[in-house]
């Protein structure tokens, strides 16, 4: 799994002009599923994201987690994180998991994360418009293959 984690003041996702999900302070996650991803990758990602201390404490140090601040998550499926740009000018996305498998793992990831923090989500495979106000900005890339 490749996940772009962005600390946000607020974020929302719209489909066909209608808001499908929105959060106030929390994390915007762009979630890509690879062909070799398994339940262990989900476990690792959920544990890391829910405990990652990237929110400021009263002294201004990044010392608090999404759980500590009682924030929310907006989760967006993002197969383009597996783009291969080696040849030509048009990215290839053959490195991403097949849609059926990716959808299953993405839904499992969200369900597991939702046991720890409130989760809003986009619609898998839909054309979405994402709006956000970055906080910091703080942007972290988590790749479950490098643990």
Swiss-Prot record:
Q: Which domain of life is it from?
A: Bacteria
Q: Quick one: where is this thing mainly located?
A: cytoplasm
Concerning InterPro entries, the annotation shows: Daa-tRNA_deacyls_DTD, DTD-like_sf
Alphabetically sorted, this entry's keywords are: Cytoplasm, Hydrolase, RNA-binding, tRNA-binding
Q: Where is this motif: Gly-cisPro motif, important for rejection of L-amino acids?
A: 136-137
Q: In the UniProt record, does the keyword Hydrolase occur? A: yes
| GO BP of this protein | D-amino acid catabolic process
Which chemical reaction does it catalyze?
Answer: glycyl-tRNA(Ala) + H2O = tRNA(Ala) + glycine + H(+); a D-aminoacyl-tRNA + H2O = a tRNA + a D-alpha-amino acid + H(+)
Q: Which EC number(s) are documented for this chain?
A: 3.1.1.96
Q: Which GO terms describe its molecular function?
A: D-tyrosyl-tRNA(Tyr) deacylase activity; Gly-tRNA(Ala) deacylase activity; Ser(Gly)-tRNA(Ala) hydrolase activity; tRNA binding
Is Magnesium a UniProt keyword of this protein?
no
**Subcellular location(s) of the protein:** Cytoplasm
Q: What GO CC terms are in its UniProt record?
A: cytoplasm
Tell me which Pfam families the record gives: Tyr_Deacylase
Q: How does it assemble?
A: Homodimer.
Query: What job does this protein perform?
Result: An aminoacyl-tRNA editing enzyme that deacylates mischarged D-aminoacyl-tRNAs. Also deacylates mischarged glycyl-tRNA(Ala), protecting cells against glycine mischarging by AlaRS. Acts via tRNA-based rather than protein-based catalysis; rejects L-amino acids rather than detecting D-amino acids in the active site. By recycling D-aminoacyl-tRNA to D-amino acids and free tRNA molecules, this enzyme counteracts the toxicity associated with the formation of D-aminoacyl-tRNA entities in vivo and helps enforce protein L-homochirality.
Family membership, please give it.
Answer: Belongs to the DTD family.
Q: What is known of its domains?
A: A Gly-cisPro motif from one monomer fits into the active site of the other monomer to allow specific chiral rejection of L-amino acids.
Q: What is this protein called?
A: D-aminoacyl-tRNA deacylase
UniProt lineage: Bacteria, Bacillati, Bacillota, Bacilli, Lactobacillales
């Amino acid at each position: 799994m490749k996940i772009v984690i962005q600390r946000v003041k607020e974020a929302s996702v719209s489909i066909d002009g209608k808001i499908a999900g929105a959060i106030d302070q929390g994390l915007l996650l762009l979630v890509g599923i690879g062909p070799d991803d398994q339940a262990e990758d989900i476990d690792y990602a959920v544990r890391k994201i829910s405990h990652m201390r990237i929110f400021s404490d009263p002294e201004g140090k990044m010392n608090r987690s999404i759980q500590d601040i009682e924030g929310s998550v907006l989760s967006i499926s993002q197969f383009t994180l597996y783009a291969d740009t080696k040849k030509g000018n048009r990215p290839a996305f053959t490195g991403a998991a097949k849609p059926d498998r990716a959808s299953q793992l993405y839904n499992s990831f969200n369900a597991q994360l939702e046991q720890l923090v409130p989760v809003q989500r986009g619609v898998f495979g839909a054309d979405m418009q994402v709006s956000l106000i970055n906080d910091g900005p703080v942007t972290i890339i988590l790749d479950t293959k490098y643990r």
